[in-house]
Protein backbone atom coordinates (compact mmCIF):
# COMPACT_ATOMS: atom_id res chain seq x y z
CA UNK A 1 0.00 0.00 0.00
CA UNK A 2 1.34 3.43 -0.97
CA UNK A 3 1.96 5.72 1.96
CA UNK A 4 0.07 8.99 1.86
CA UNK A 5 2.05 12.18 1.43
CA UNK A 6 1.26 14.93 3.94
CA UNK A 7 1.66 18.70 4.25
CA UNK A 8 1.48 20.29 7.70
CA UNK A 9 0.56 23.86 8.64
CA UNK A 10 1.64 24.18 12.28
CA UNK A 11 1.82 26.88 14.93
CA UNK A 12 1.91 27.29 18.69
CA UNK A 13 2.38 24.79 21.49
CA UNK A 14 -0.11 22.31 20.02
CA UNK A 15 1.47 22.53 16.58
CA UNK A 16 4.93 21.91 18.02
CA UNK A 17 3.84 18.88 20.06
CA UNK A 18 2.05 17.32 17.11
CA UNK A 19 4.90 17.97 14.68
CA UNK A 20 7.20 16.14 17.09
CA UNK A 21 4.71 13.26 17.26
CA UNK A 22 4.36 13.05 13.47
CA UNK A 23 8.09 13.25 12.82
CA UNK A 24 8.69 10.48 15.32
CA UNK A 25 6.13 8.04 13.94
CA UNK A 26 5.33 9.17 10.37
CA UNK A 27 8.41 11.08 9.21
CA UNK A 28 8.68 9.44 5.78
CA UNK A 29 5.18 10.64 4.87
CA UNK A 30 5.72 14.34 5.56
CA UNK A 31 6.58 16.39 2.47
CA UNK A 32 6.50 19.89 3.91
CA UNK A 33 5.96 21.79 7.17
CA UNK A 34 4.72 25.39 6.92
CA UNK A 35 5.03 27.68 9.94
CA UNK A 36 3.45 31.04 10.69
CA UNK A 37 6.80 32.50 11.73
CA UNK A 38 10.36 31.37 12.32
CA UNK A 39 10.07 29.40 15.54
CA UNK A 40 10.81 26.13 17.30
CA UNK A 41 8.70 24.21 14.79
CA UNK A 42 10.92 25.52 11.99
CA UNK A 43 14.01 24.31 13.84
CA UNK A 44 12.47 20.89 14.46
CA UNK A 45 11.65 20.51 10.75
CA UNK A 46 15.13 21.65 9.69
CA UNK A 47 16.80 19.26 12.12
CA UNK A 48 14.69 16.43 10.72
CA UNK A 49 15.68 17.49 7.19
CA UNK A 50 12.07 18.13 6.23
CA UNK A 51 11.39 20.95 3.79
CA UNK A 52 9.95 23.96 5.61
CA UNK A 53 9.19 27.62 5.04
CA UNK A 54 7.45 30.50 6.80
CA UNK A 55 4.04 31.63 5.53
CA UNK A 56 4.36 34.96 3.72
CA UNK A 57 1.20 35.36 1.65
CA UNK A 58 -1.16 33.13 -0.30
CA UNK A 59 0.58 33.65 -3.65
CA UNK A 60 3.91 32.62 -2.15
CA UNK A 61 2.24 29.65 -0.48
CA UNK A 62 0.59 28.40 -3.66
CA UNK A 63 3.80 28.68 -5.67
CA UNK A 64 5.78 26.73 -3.05
CA UNK A 65 3.35 23.90 -2.33
CA UNK A 66 3.93 20.47 -3.84
CA UNK A 67 1.90 20.11 -7.03
CA UNK A 68 0.01 17.21 -5.51
CA UNK A 69 -0.17 15.63 -2.08
CA UNK A 70 -2.68 13.41 -0.34
CA UNK A 71 -3.55 15.17 2.91
CA UNK A 72 -3.14 18.55 4.56
CA UNK A 73 -3.45 19.27 8.29
CA UNK A 74 -3.94 22.58 10.09
CA UNK A 75 -2.41 22.20 13.54
CA UNK A 76 -3.34 25.29 15.57
CA UNK A 77 -3.04 27.31 12.35
CA UNK A 78 -4.23 30.96 12.76
CA UNK A 79 -5.06 31.80 9.11
CA UNK A 80 -7.80 30.89 6.65
CA UNK A 81 -6.81 28.60 3.80
CA UNK A 82 -7.92 29.69 0.33
CA UNK A 83 -9.88 27.48 -2.04
CA UNK A 84 -6.96 27.21 -4.49
CA UNK A 85 -4.83 25.68 -1.74
CA UNK A 86 -7.55 23.32 -0.54
CA UNK A 87 -7.91 21.95 -4.06
CA UNK A 88 -4.26 20.89 -4.28
CA UNK A 89 -4.71 18.18 -1.66
CA UNK A 90 -6.08 14.96 -3.13
CA UNK A 91 -8.06 13.99 -0.01
CA UNK A 92 -8.52 17.46 1.43
CA UNK A 93 -7.47 19.24 4.60
CA UNK A 94 -8.34 18.60 8.23
CA UNK A 95 -8.38 21.26 10.94
CA UNK A 96 -7.96 20.97 14.70
CA UNK A 97 -10.31 23.48 16.37
CA UNK A 98 -10.51 24.19 20.13
CA UNK A 99 -14.29 24.18 20.48
CA UNK A 100 -17.12 21.67 20.51
CA UNK A 101 -18.38 22.45 17.02
CA UNK A 102 -20.79 23.73 15.84
CA UNK A 103 -20.48 26.00 18.88
CA UNK A 104 -17.88 28.79 18.91
CA UNK A 105 -16.68 28.70 15.34
CA UNK A 106 -14.04 31.36 14.70
CA UNK A 107 -12.03 33.17 17.33
CA UNK A 108 -11.66 32.85 21.12
CA UNK A 109 -13.90 29.82 21.75
CA UNK A 110 -12.61 29.51 25.33
CA UNK A 111 -14.05 32.98 26.06
CA UNK A 112 -17.42 32.41 24.42
CA UNK A 113 -18.01 29.00 25.97
CA UNK A 114 -17.98 30.63 29.42
CA UNK A 115 -19.55 33.94 28.44
CA UNK A 116 -22.51 32.33 26.68
CA UNK A 117 -22.59 29.10 28.70
CA UNK A 118 -22.19 26.93 25.61
CA UNK A 119 -20.82 23.37 25.42
CA UNK A 120 -17.03 23.27 25.17
CA UNK A 121 -14.48 20.84 23.84
CA UNK A 122 -12.22 20.19 20.85
CA UNK A 123 -12.98 19.02 17.31
CA UNK A 124 -11.33 17.75 14.15
CA UNK A 125 -13.18 18.64 10.96
CA UNK A 126 -12.78 18.74 7.20
CA UNK A 127 -11.74 22.16 5.94
CA UNK A 128 -14.16 24.03 3.67
CA UNK A 129 -14.05 27.59 2.31
CA UNK A 130 -16.13 28.96 5.17
CA UNK A 131 -14.44 29.10 8.58
CA UNK A 132 -14.82 25.97 10.76
CA UNK A 133 -17.78 24.59 8.78
CA UNK A 134 -16.60 21.25 7.40
CA UNK A 135 -17.91 17.87 8.50
CA UNK A 136 -16.81 16.90 12.02
CA UNK A 137 -14.92 13.60 12.22
CA UNK A 138 -13.91 13.54 15.91
CA UNK A 139 -14.70 15.43 19.12
CA UNK A 140 -13.99 15.44 22.84
CA UNK A 141 -16.10 17.46 25.25
CA UNK A 142 -14.56 19.39 28.14
CA UNK A 143 -16.76 20.13 31.18
CA UNK A 144 -16.69 23.69 32.54
CA UNK A 145 -16.63 24.22 36.31
CA UNK A 146 -17.10 27.44 38.26
CA UNK A 147 -13.36 27.44 39.00
CA UNK A 148 -12.56 27.61 35.28
CA UNK A 149 -11.68 30.76 33.40
CA UNK A 150 -10.54 31.63 29.89
CA UNK A 151 -6.99 30.61 30.71
CA UNK A 152 -7.79 27.23 32.25
CA UNK A 153 -10.08 26.29 29.36
CA UNK A 154 -7.38 27.25 26.87
CA UNK A 155 -4.87 24.96 28.62
CA UNK A 156 -7.39 22.12 28.77
CA UNK A 157 -8.15 22.51 25.06
CA UNK A 158 -4.44 22.34 24.19
CA UNK A 159 -4.10 19.03 26.02
CA UNK A 160 -7.27 17.53 24.54
CA UNK A 161 -6.44 18.71 21.00
CA UNK A 162 -3.13 16.87 21.19
CA UNK A 163 -4.76 13.71 22.58
CA UNK A 164 -7.62 13.75 20.06
CA UNK A 165 -5.31 14.23 17.09
CA UNK A 166 -2.98 11.41 18.13
CA UNK A 167 -5.98 9.11 18.46
CA UNK A 168 -7.64 10.18 15.19
CA UNK A 169 -4.70 10.66 12.81
CA UNK A 170 -4.05 6.93 12.15
CA UNK A 171 -7.73 6.46 11.30
CA UNK A 172 -7.53 9.26 8.73
CA UNK A 173 -4.45 7.68 7.14
CA UNK A 174 -6.16 4.29 6.89
CA UNK A 175 -9.48 5.71 5.62
CA UNK A 176 -11.24 4.41 8.71
CA UNK A 177 -13.35 7.51 9.33
CA UNK A 178 -16.78 6.05 8.61
CA UNK A 179 -19.00 8.56 10.40
CA UNK A 180 -19.14 12.35 10.29
CA UNK A 181 -21.23 14.88 12.19
CA UNK A 182 -23.05 17.69 10.42
CA UNK A 183 -21.48 21.03 11.31
CA UNK A 184 -24.36 23.49 10.95
CA UNK A 185 -25.92 26.02 13.29
CA UNK A 186 -24.10 26.73 16.54
CA UNK A 187 -22.33 30.07 16.83
CA UNK A 188 -19.56 32.08 15.16
CA UNK A 189 -17.38 34.91 16.47
CA UNK A 190 -14.93 37.35 14.94
CA UNK A 191 -11.65 38.44 16.54
CA UNK A 192 -12.97 41.87 17.55
CA UNK A 193 -16.13 40.62 19.28
CA UNK A 194 -14.38 39.52 22.48
CA UNK A 195 -12.77 42.94 22.89
CA UNK A 196 -16.08 44.75 22.35
CA UNK A 197 -17.70 42.50 24.95
CA UNK A 198 -15.01 43.13 27.57
CA UNK A 199 -15.95 46.61 28.78
CA UNK A 200 -17.83 46.73 32.11
CA UNK A 201 -20.37 49.57 32.22
CA UNK A 202 -20.44 50.94 35.78
CA UNK A 203 -23.94 52.32 35.25
CA UNK A 204 -25.40 49.06 33.96
CA UNK A 205 -27.18 46.40 36.00
CA UNK A 206 -25.90 42.83 35.62
CA UNK A 207 -27.18 39.54 36.94
CA UNK A 208 -24.48 38.21 39.27
CA UNK A 209 -24.13 35.00 37.24
CA UNK A 210 -23.71 36.90 33.97
CA UNK A 211 -21.10 39.24 35.45
CA UNK A 212 -19.13 36.38 37.01
CA UNK A 213 -19.17 34.52 33.69
CA UNK A 214 -17.99 37.57 31.76
CA UNK A 215 -15.17 38.29 34.20
CA UNK A 216 -13.89 34.74 34.39
CA UNK A 217 -14.22 34.23 30.63
CA UNK A 218 -11.73 37.06 30.11
CA UNK A 219 -9.45 36.05 33.00
CA UNK A 220 -6.28 34.59 31.48
CA UNK A 221 -2.91 34.96 33.20
CA UNK A 222 -0.65 37.34 31.30
CA UNK A 223 -3.45 38.55 28.98
CA UNK A 224 -5.70 41.64 29.03
CA UNK A 225 -8.94 41.24 30.96
CA UNK A 226 -12.33 42.89 31.28
CA UNK A 227 -12.02 46.58 32.07
CA UNK A 228 -13.90 49.70 33.07
CA UNK A 229 -13.12 53.40 32.93
CA UNK A 230 -13.70 56.06 35.55
CA UNK A 231 -12.57 59.69 35.56
CA UNK A 232 -10.32 59.22 32.52
CA UNK A 233 -8.63 56.20 34.10
CA UNK A 234 -8.87 52.63 32.87
CA UNK A 235 -8.94 49.65 35.24
CA UNK A 236 -8.67 45.94 34.48
CA UNK A 237 -10.71 43.37 36.42
CA UNK A 238 -9.98 39.68 36.94
CA UNK A 239 -11.73 37.13 39.09
CA UNK A 240 -10.71 33.96 40.90
CA UNK A 241 -13.29 31.44 42.06
CA UNK A 242 -12.35 28.60 44.41
CA UNK A 243 -14.44 25.58 45.26
CA UNK A 244 -14.63 25.00 49.01
CA UNK A 245 -15.55 21.90 50.94
CA UNK A 246 -18.83 22.16 52.82
CA UNK A 247 -18.77 20.57 56.25
CA UNK A 248 -22.10 19.04 57.16
What are the roles of these predicted feature ranges?
Residues 1-248:
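One-carbon transfer enzymes
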Amino acid sequence: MNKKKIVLFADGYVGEKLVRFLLRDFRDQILLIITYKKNQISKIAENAQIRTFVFCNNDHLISNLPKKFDLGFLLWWPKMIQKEILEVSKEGFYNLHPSLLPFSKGKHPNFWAIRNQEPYGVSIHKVREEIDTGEIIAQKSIPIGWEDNGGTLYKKSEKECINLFKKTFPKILLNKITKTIKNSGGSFHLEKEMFLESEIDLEKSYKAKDLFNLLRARTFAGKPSCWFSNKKNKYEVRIKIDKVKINI
